[in-house]
C-alpha cells in the first residue's frame, strides 16, 4: 500500500497489433505445452522458457548457467535469460495470425459496436465475418462513371449476341424438325411417330430458350449490380459475385471475413461520418434520428480518443503469462491444466494449418473454411459461448475463456481483487466470556502463539532466550515455558480484530484487547453479541491481527468495541443488556408488597445488606435507607432544609439501591423498574452525556449485576407456570355462535364468499384478542413467564398467547388466511387436523427466511455499489438550502406532541437557518447540531418545524460536506472528513433487510377495498423503490390543478381533468374496479393521487420535480421499515436517493460538447453549461433522470467499479472503446489496484502527516544506546523500522544455513 507508486488515473483502451507485439517477449509457434518425459517446457510452445522466462530461479533451460551470479545473461545455447522464475507471472507472448480476426466483444456485444460504426446490421456483419457473404470494400467511382457508356455498349452487344445465338439455335432445331417430318411422311410413318418427333423438338427448343434466358437474366443481373454497386454492399450469391469480379474486377474490390472489415476500417473517414450524423440528428426524426444518435456515440468515441478502430480487428493475439494458466501434475502422473491452454492450443493449431494451406496455395474455399475456423477459435478464447455452441472439455463442460475469468462471483474482480485471503488470521468457535471487560476478548493460547509467532520469535532473540531466529522458531514450535511469558508480554496493548460472517454492517468487525485463555474457543463479551448478531450455538468467528503501528492505532481508537456503543443506522446504543442481564436487573428492581423487613429504616446501605444476608430483609421490600451522595431525580420531594450533597433518607428497596450503585456516582437516582425500555433509556442517556470510558464501565457493571442477580433470582419455567384462562371456553362459545350465524347467512345466499371470509376472519381475530387479554390478566405478576415477557428479556405476548391461550388463525400454503382458527393452545395440545394446518405456515416461514437472506444480501451489495464514492470531502459546501422537517404535531385533542419520527428525521442534523420564535428571538442559530436537548428546547418553545441541512441539498461537487450530513450517528459527534458515509448508509439500509418480510401479503379475498390487490411490501417493495421500477397496479397522479369529471363506459372509467389555466384536458383511463380517491366535480391539485394504489416515482419526478421525487422515495422507503418497527435515520436513505438522481439526460446540446440523449453527471452538465455561457454561447438543456441503483452503479464514471459490479464484459467493451480514464475517486477502484482507500485515514490530509519530535524528545532519545543507528522519526511514512514489525522470513539471513 505504498504511496511511491501512486497514480491518479487509470485508463483502458483498445490494443493494436503493434501494442500486442510490443508487450510480447516472443512468438508462440507450437501448440505443445510441456514434454511429458522430462516435464520441461517445449521450445516455442505455450510454456516456452525462452519466451516467458526460466521455470527455476537463476537457471537457464539447458543448465549451462546456474546461480545468481549470472543474473541477466542470455544463454547462447538455449536463448533463456537467467533471472527469477516469477517473471513467468508477468511476461507475455503472442501468436501471429495468418489472417486477421475480429474481436468478438465488439461485433457480438449488444449493441454491436462494429455494426454501429460501419452501419451494418449484426446479421449482415456475421455473414461477412464468418464467410457467408462477400462485402464490397471499395469502388473506383471515377473510372466506372467514365467507362459506363462503353461498358453499356459492350453489354448491349453481348446481350444481342446471346439473343441472336438463341434465335439461331431455335431456327436450326425448327429446320431439322421439318426435314425429319418430311422423311417420316416419305416413309409413310404413323401420326404417333410424327407427334413424338414434334414433342422432342419442342423440348429441345424449350431447353435452349430456358438456358439462354437464364444467361441473359444473369447478364442483366450482373450489369444492374455493377451499375449500382457501392461500398458496404453484401453479396451472398457466390456465383454472381465471381462473375461480377471476372467481368468488372478492375472497378471494385470485395472480400470476405475479417479482412473485409479491416479494409473498410482502414478507409473509414471518422470526421466526415460524424458531420453527417450530426446533420441527421439536427434535421431527422423518429427511428433515423435515434439510430444516428447511437452511431454518433461510437464514432465520437474514436474521434475524441487516440483509439484506432483497427484495434477491433486483430492481426496478433496476446498470450497471457504461463503462471496465470498453470499446468500441474496430479498424483497419478496425469496433468491438470487451465482451460485457457486448451483454447490457445486450438488457436495455434488452426493458425498453423492455415499457414500451411496458404503456402500450398490451396483452393479459396478450403482456405476460407480454415479462416472461419480460426475466427471461431479466437472467439472462444476471448468469450466462449458468446456465439454458437461453446467449446466443451471432458464431460461436456464449457471451457472457461478469458471473459469468464473476469465475470461473476468467482471472477478475477470479485474473487481476487475485491476480496482476498489474508495472513495473520485464524478462526474458531465462540463461547461466552462473562468475566471479560467490554474491550476484551479471550484468545486461545495456541491460536495467539500462532498469530503472534514472528513477534514472539523476535522478542525471544532480543531477550537472549534464543541465539537466532531459527532456534527461536524451534522454541516456539516446542512450546518452551519462556515462550508463554514472552507471548503474555507481547499481546498486552496489541489489539486484535474479531469478525463474524455475515458482516452486514460496520459493527461486524471490532477490535478487542486479547486475554490469553485455556481451551480452543474464542471468548466473546456478552454485550457485543448484539452488534455481531452472534449466539453461542456453534457460531464461529475470525481473528485478524493489525500489524503496523498505524493499523494498531486505528484499531484501538476507531474500532475498539468500547468506542462502538452506538448503532450507525439510528444512533442508538447497540450494547444493551439483554436476556439474562435484563431479567436479573428486573428482579433486582421490582417492588414486592408484604415481604420480609418492609417499612424498616436503615442508617446505611451496609446495614441493609447485613439485614439481607441475615435473611431479615427481602431484596424487594419497600424500606427507608440513608444514602450518601444522593443525586435527586426530577419529581423527588426533598425534605425541608435538604441540600445537594447531604445524605438523604430515601424510601426505596435494597435492590433499587444496588442497581443505582452500578450507575455513575453523579447520575440521577433511578426509581423505575429496570426493564428493557428503561435500560435502553439509561444507556442512551449515558452515551449522550458521559465520556465513553464511563459508559463502558457502567455497561460492565450492569452486565455483572445482571448475571449475578439472574442467577439468584431463580427464574425458571415449569409447565405449571402456563395457566390456561378459565374463561376461554365461554369466550369461544360466544364467538362460535356468531360465526355460525355468518355461515347461515352465506348458506341462504345473503352474502358472497368474500364477505363471509372477511367476517369470519374478523370474528376470530376478536376472539383471539379477547382470550389473549383474559390470559394476561390471569397471570400473576410473579409468574416467571409474565416476568420474562414484561421485562423484555425474552419472548412476546403473542408467543405466550399461543402457548397458554389460543393458537388463532393461520395461513395456508398460498399465504391466504384460513377462516377457521386453531382453537387449542400448545399447553392443551393440538388435534391432528389442527397440527396439520399449522405446519403450512411453519414450512412457509422457513422457506421465506432462506429466500430473504439471499435477496437482502444482494440488495446490500447493490446499495454499497451505488453509494461507495459518497465520502465526506469538505467541512461546509456553503449552501443555504435544506429540508423542512416537522418536530411536533397536534394530537387528537389539538395539543402539540413530539413527532414520533423525530428520532430519524430532525435528530442529529445541522440547522440550515436560525430558528426564531414568534417574538423574533433566536432560539437556535444556523449550524447548531440538533441533539435530543436542542429538539426538546425547541419543542417546549412551541416550534413545530425546522429547516435542516441535508445530503439531498448539498452542493459539494464530489461526495458531500460535513455540515450537510450532520452528526455521525455512530460516534455522536459531527462527522469527520473522510468518513465513508455512502457505505455506512448502504449497510444501515441493507442490514435490517433480512428482518423485512418477503412476500407480497395477500390476506385472502377482498382485503383492501381495492378488490384484494396484492400490496407489495417488505423487501420486494424496497427493491422496487431503489430500482425505480414502475410498480404493479400503478395509480395515476394529477398533472395539472383543475376540476375532475368521471366518465364511465362498459369496459373502463376515464378520469378527465379540466385544468384551471385553460390548457387542453388530460384524461386517465383506469380499471372499473379501481377505488377512486376523488369524486365527480372535485378540485384536484398538481401531484394529487387519483385512485388507490402505489405511485410511480418517475411520474412524481416528471410532474412535480426532483425535490418532490426525493421526498417521495425517502418517505416510501421509511414507511416500509417503520411498518416492521425498524428505525433507520432518514439521512441514510437520502444518501442513496441522491445517488439515484445524480444524472441528467441531455435534451438539446446547445453549443456544448454534450450529445443529445446522453446521460451526464449533474456536476459535469452544470460545468459544461457554465463554460459555454461564460463564452456567450447557447447552453445545453436537460431533464433530471431517476435511475435504479443497478443502472446508476453501471453508469458510474469509474469503469473499474462498474466492471467489478455486473455485466463485466459489456462495461469493459464500452470503456475500452471510449478510452475511459478512471479518476480513482471511489473506494472499490482503489481496493482493486491495491491503494489505500480515499476515506478515513487514507485521505492525503492524514497520510501526508509527518511527525516531528520535540527538542526534549530528541535529547532523551540519544541518551541510551540506540537500537537503530540512523533512526527515522517518520513513523507514519513507515520508512523507519518501528518496533514489533513482523520479519519476512524469506529475506532474513538465517545465519546457519545447512543446505
UniProtKB/Swiss-Prot annotation:
Pfam families: RNA_pol_Rpb1_1, RNA_pol_Rpb1_2, RNA_pol_Rpb1_3, RNA_pol_Rpb1_4, RNA_pol_Rpb1_5. One of its GO terms (molecular function) is DNA binding. Mg(2+) binds at residues 535, 537, 539. Zn(2+) 1 binds at residues 60, 62, 75, 78. Belongs to the RNA polymerase beta' chain family. HAMAP family: RNApol_bact_RpoC (MF_01322). This is DNA-directed RNA polymerase subunit beta'.
Amino acid at each position: 500500500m505504498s504511496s511511491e507508486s501512486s497514480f491518479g488515473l487509470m485508463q483502458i483502451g483498445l490494443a493494436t497489433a503493434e501494442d500486442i507485439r510490443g508487450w510480447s517477449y516472443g512468438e508462440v509457434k507450437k501448440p505443445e505445452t510441456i514434454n511429458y518425459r522430462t516435464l520441461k517446457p517445449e521450445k516455442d510452445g505455450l510454456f516456452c522458457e525462452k519466451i516467458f522466462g526460466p521455470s527455476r530461479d537463476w537457471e537457464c533451460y539447458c543448465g549451462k548457467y546456474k546461480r545468481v551470479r549470472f543474473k541477466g545473461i542470455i544463454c547462447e545455447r538455449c536463448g533463456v535469460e537467467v533471472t527469477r522464475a516469477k517473471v513467468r507471472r508477468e511476461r507475455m507472448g503472442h501468436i501471429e495470425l495468418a489472417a486477421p480476426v475480429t474481436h468478438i466483444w465488439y461485433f457480438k456485444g449488444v449493441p454491436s459496436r462494429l455494426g454501429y460504426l460501419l452501419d451494418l446490421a449484426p446479421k449482415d456483419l456475421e455473414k461477412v465475418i464468418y464467410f457467408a457473404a462477400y462485402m464490397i470494400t471499395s469502388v473506383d467511382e471515377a473510372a466506372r462513371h467514365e467507362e459506363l457508356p462503353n461498358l453499356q455498349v459492350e453489354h448491349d452487344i453481348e446481350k444481342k449476341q446471346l439473343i441472336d445465338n438463341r434465335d439461331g439455335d431455335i431456327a436450326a432445331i425448327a429446320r431439322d424438325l421439318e426435314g425429319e417430318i418430311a422423311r417420316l411422311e416419305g416413309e409413310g410413318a404413323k401420326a404417333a411417330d410424327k407427334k413424338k418427333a414434334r414433342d422432342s423438338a419442342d423440348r429441345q427448343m424449350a431447353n435452349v430458350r430456358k438456358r439462354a434466358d437464364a444467361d441473359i437474366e444473369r447478364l442483366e443481373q450482373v450489369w444492374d449490380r455493377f451499375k449500382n454497386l457501392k461500398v458496404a454492399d453484401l453479396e451472398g450469391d457466390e456465383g454472381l459475385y465471381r462473375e461480377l469480379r471476372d467481368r468488372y474486377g478492375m472497378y471494385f474490390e470485395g472480400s470476405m471475413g475479417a479482412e473485409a472489415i479491416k479494409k473498410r476500417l482502414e478507409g473509414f473517414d471518422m470526421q466526415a461520418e460524424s458531420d453527417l450524423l450530426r446533420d441527421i440528428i439536427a434535421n431527422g426524426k423518429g427511428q433515423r434520428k435515434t439510430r444516428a444518435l447511437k452511431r454518433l456515440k461510437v464514432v465520437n468515441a474514436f474521434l475524441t480518443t487516440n483509439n484506432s478502430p483497427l484495434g477491433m480487428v486483430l492481426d496478433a493475439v496476446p498470450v497471457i503469462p504461463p503462471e496465470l494458466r498453470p499446468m500441474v501434475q496430479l498424483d497419478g502422473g496425469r496433468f491438470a491444466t487451465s482451460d485457457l491452454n486448451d483454447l490457445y492450443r486450438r488457436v495455434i493449431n488452426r493458425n498453423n494449418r492455415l499457414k500451411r494451406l496458404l503456402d500450398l496455395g490451396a483452393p479459396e474455399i478450403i482456405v476460407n473454411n480454415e479462416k472461419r475456423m480460426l475466427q471461431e477459435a479466437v472467439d472462444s478464447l476471448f468469450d466462449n459461448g458468446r456465439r454458437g455452441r461453446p467449446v466443451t472439455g471432458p464431460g461436456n463442460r464449457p471451457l472457461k475463456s478469458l471473459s469468464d475469468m473476469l465475470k461473476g462471483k468467482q471472477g478475477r474482480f470479485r474473487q481476487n481483487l475485491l476480496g482476498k485471503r489474508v495472513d495473520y488470521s485464524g478462526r474458531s468457535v465462540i463461547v461466552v466470556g462473562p468475566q471479560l471487560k467490554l474491550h476484551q476478548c479471550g484468545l486461545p493460547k495456541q491460536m495467539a502463539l500462532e498469530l503472534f509467532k514472528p513477534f514472539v520469535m523476535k522478542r525471544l532473540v532480543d531477550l537472549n532466550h534464543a541465539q537466532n531466529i531459527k532456534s527461536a522458531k524451534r522454541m516456539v514450535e516446542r512450546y518452551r515455558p519462556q515462550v508463554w511469558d514472552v507471548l503474555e508480554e507481547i499481546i498486552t496493548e496489541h489489539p486484535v480484530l474479531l469478525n463474524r460472517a455475515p458482516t452486514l454492517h460496520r459493527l461486524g468487525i471490532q477490535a478487542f484487547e486479547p486475554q490469553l485463555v485455556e481451551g480452543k474457543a474464542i471468548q466473546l463479551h456478552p454485550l457485543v453479541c448484539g452488534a455481531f448478531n452472534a449466539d453461542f450455538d456453534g457460531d464461529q468467528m475470525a481473528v485478524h491481527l493489525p500489524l503496523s503501528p498505524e493499523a494498531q492505532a486505528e484499531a484501538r481508537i476507531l474500532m475498539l468495541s468500547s468506542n462502538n456503543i452506538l448503532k450507525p443506522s439510528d444512533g442508538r446504543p447497540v450494547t444493551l443488556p439483554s436476556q439474562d442481564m435484563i431479567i436479573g436487573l428486573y428482579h433486582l428492581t421490582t417492588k414486592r408488597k408484604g415481604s420480609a423487613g418492609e417499612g424498616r429504616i436503615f442508617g446505611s446501605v451496609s446495614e441493609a445488606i447485613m439485614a439481607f444476608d441475615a435473611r431479615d430483609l427481602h431484596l424487594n421490600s419497600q424500606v427507608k435507607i440513608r444514602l450518601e451522595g444522593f443525586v435527586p431525580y426530577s419529581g423527588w420531594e426533598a425534605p425541608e432544609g435538604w441540600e445537594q450533597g447531604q445524605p438523604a433518607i430515601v424510601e426505596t428497596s435494597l435492590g433499587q439501591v444496588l442497581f443505582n450503585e452500578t450507575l455513575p456516582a453523579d447520575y440521577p437516582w433511578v426509581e423505575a423498574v429496570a426493564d428493557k425500555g428503561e435500560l435502553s433509556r439509561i444507556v442512551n442517556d449515558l452515551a449522550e452525556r458521559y465520556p465513553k470510558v464511563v459508559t463502558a464501565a457502567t455497561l460492565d457493571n450492569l452486565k455483572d449485576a445482571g448475571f449475578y442477580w439472574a442467577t439468584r433470582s431463580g427464574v425458571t419455567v415449569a409447565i405449571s407456570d402456563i395457566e390456561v384462562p378459565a374463561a376461554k371456553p365461554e369466550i369461544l362459545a360466544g364467538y362460535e355462535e356468531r360465526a355460525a350465524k355468518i355461515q347461515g347467512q352465506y348458506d341462504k345466499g345473503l352474502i358472497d364468499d368474500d364477505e363471509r371470509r372477511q367476517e369470519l376472519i374478523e370474528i376470530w381475530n376478536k376472539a383471539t384478542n379477547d382470550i389473549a387479554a383474559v390470559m394476561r390478566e390471569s397471570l400473576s405478576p410473579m409468574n416467571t413467564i409474565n416476568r420474562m415477557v414484561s421485562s423484555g428479556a425474552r419472548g412476546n405476548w403473542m408467543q405466550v398467547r399461543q402457548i397458554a391461550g389460543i393458537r388463532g388463525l393461520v395461513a395456508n400454503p398460498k399465504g391466504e388466511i384460513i377462516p377457521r382458527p386453531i382453537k387449542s393452545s400448545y399447553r392443551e395440545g393440538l388435534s391432528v387436523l389442527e397440527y396439520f394446518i399449522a405446519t403450512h405456515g411453519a414450512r412457509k416461514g422457513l422457506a421465506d427466511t432462506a429466500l430473504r437472506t439471499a435477496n437482502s444480501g444482494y440488495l446490500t451489495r447493490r446499495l454499497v455499489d451505488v453509494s461507495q464514492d459518497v465520502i465526506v470531502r469538505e467541512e461546509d459546501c456553503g449552501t443555504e438550502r435544506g429540508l423542512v422537517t416537522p418536530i411536533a404535531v397536534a394530537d387528537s385533542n389539538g395539543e402539540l406532541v413530539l413527532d414520533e419520527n423525530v428520532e430519524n428525521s430532525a435528530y442529529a442534523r445541522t440547522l440550515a437557518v436560525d430558528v426564531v420564535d414568534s417574538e423574533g428571538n433566536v432560539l437556535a442559530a444556523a449550524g447548531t447540531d440538533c441533539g435530543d436537548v436542542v429538539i426538546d428546547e425547541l419543542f417546549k418553545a412551541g416550534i413545530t418545524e425546522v429547516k435542516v441541512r441535508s445530503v439531498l441539498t448539498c452542493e459539494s461537487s464530489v461526495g458531500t460536506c460535513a455540515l450537510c450530513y450532520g452528526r455521525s450517528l455512530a460516534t455522536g459527534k459531527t462527522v469527520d472528513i473522510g468518513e465513508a458515509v455512502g457505505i455506512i448508509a448502504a449497510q444501515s439500509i441493507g442490514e435490517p433487510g433480512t428482518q423485512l418480510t418477503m412476500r407480497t401479503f395477500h390476506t385472502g379475498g377482498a382485503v383492501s377495498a381495492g378488490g384484494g390487490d396484492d400490496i407489495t411490501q417488505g423487501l420486494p417493495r424496497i427493491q422496487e423503490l431503489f430500482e425505480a421500477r414502475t410498480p404493479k397496479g400503478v395509480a395515476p397522479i394529477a398533472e395539472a390543478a383543475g376540476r375532475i369529471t368521471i366518465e364511465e363506459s362498459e369496459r373502463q372509467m376515464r378520469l378527465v381533468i379540466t385544468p384551471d389555466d385553460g390548457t387542453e384536458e388530460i384524461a386517465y383511463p383506469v380499471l372499473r374496479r379501481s377505488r377512486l380517491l376523488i369524486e365527480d366535480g372535485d378540485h384536484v391539485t398538481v401531484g394529487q393521487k387519483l385512485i388507490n394504489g402505489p405511485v410511480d416515482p418517475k411520474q412524481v419526478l416528471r410532474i412535480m420535480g426532483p425535490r418532490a421525487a426525493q421526498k417521495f422515495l425517502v418517505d416510501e422507503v421509511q414507511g416500509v421499515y417503520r411498518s416492521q418497527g425498524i428505525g433507520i435515520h432518514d439521512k441514510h436513505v437520502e444518501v442513496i436517493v441522491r445517488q439515484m438522481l445524480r444524472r441528467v439526460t441531455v435534451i438539446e446540446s446547445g453549443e456544448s460538447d454534450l450529445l443529445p440523449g446522453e446521460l451526464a453527471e449533474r456536476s459535469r452538465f452544470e460545468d459544461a453549461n457554465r463554460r459555454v455561457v461564460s463564452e456567450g454561447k447557447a447552453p445545453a438543456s436537460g431533464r433530471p433522470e431517476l435511475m435504479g441503483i443497478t443502472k446508476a452503479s453501471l453508469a458510474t464514471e469509474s469503469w473499474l467499479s462498474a466492471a467489478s459490479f455486473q455485466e463485466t464484459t459489456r462495461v469493459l467493451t464500452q470503456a475500452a472503446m471510449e478510452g475511459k480514464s478512471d479518476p480513482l475517486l471511489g473506494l472499490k477502484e482503489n481496493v482493486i489496484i491495491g491503494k489505500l482507500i480515499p476515506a478515513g485515514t487514507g485521505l492525503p490530509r492524514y497520510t501526508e502527516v509527518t511527525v516531528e519530535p520535540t527538542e526534549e524528545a530528541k535529547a532523551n532519545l540519544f541518551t541510551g544506546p540506540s537500537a537503530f543507528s540512523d533512526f527515522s522519526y517518520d513513523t507514519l511514512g513507515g520508512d523507519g523500522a518501528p518496533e514489533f514489525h513482523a520479519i519476512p522470513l524469506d529475506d532474513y539471513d538465517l545465519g546457519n544455513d545447512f543446505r
